[in-house]
Amino acid sequence: FIALRIYRNSEPGKQVSRPAVLIAMVGIALGLAVMIIAVSVIVGFKSEVRDKIVGFGAHIQIGNLDAARSYETRPVVVGDSMMAALSDYPEVKHVQRYSTKPGMIKTADAFQGMVLKGVGQEYDSTFFHRHLLEGEFPQFSDSASSNRVVISKSLANKLQLKLGDKIDTYFIQDDVRARRLKIVGIYQTNFSEYDNLFLLTDLYLVNRLNNWEPDQVSGVELEIRDYDKLEETTYEIAADTDENPDRYGAEYCVRNVEQLNPQIFAWLGILDVNIWVILILMI
């Protein structure tokens, strides 16, 4: 527009040549297109990574304060009354209990470390249904064990496993415990840090492996309605929860997805700098 105004308003004999105007217009258009595409790609990539991290562990987790940063967790008591109280927060969309147990898969030719994550009927499986390649994501239980498991495509390929195979899993505590589980679903998120780690099964099974009471779990996952209110919601729940230990004296610890994955979110933050660099260079 500006280029055309300059061209039309120039005095006779001093008009800028039409090719120069066209080149300027095309250059500006290309620059804007490149800028929009670059920014869109970066923003979309950040959103995709964040959504996958949230898909594996929700926006906020409540666990045992004394638990180390590992998947061999100490339990906390989470009964129905606590679940109802957490669901009453305005920004909380969904609440679900989970338990984890590190172990190993062994086949005739190989073995692989993994984390068995137990979930129950309340688990929101939308994320895994979206990334399911084969089989099904069953409704797992907190009151019975079906000996079924959902595994990632990358782990299945590494161990040469397929849908319907039975796998031998081993867990070390005071002694070695073994469980044979049937693969009923295969998922793929292309987020290798988690794909190479997690198998999903019944909450009941994992609690039995951990020797826990029925209302003891590794923690609670909370999905919120507005990501922009993540920090605010985290501190609100923490203020109400941190000072109230369970019946065994275990203290609760509330952490959000950014606190649980600081390296990944710091890296995503660096991408914002790239956006500004692109904008400055294009201007």
What do the PLM-derived regions correspond to, one by one?
Residues 46-80:
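Membrane-interface junction motifs in transport/secretion proteins
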Residues 1-32:
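N-terminal Sec/SRP start-transfer signal
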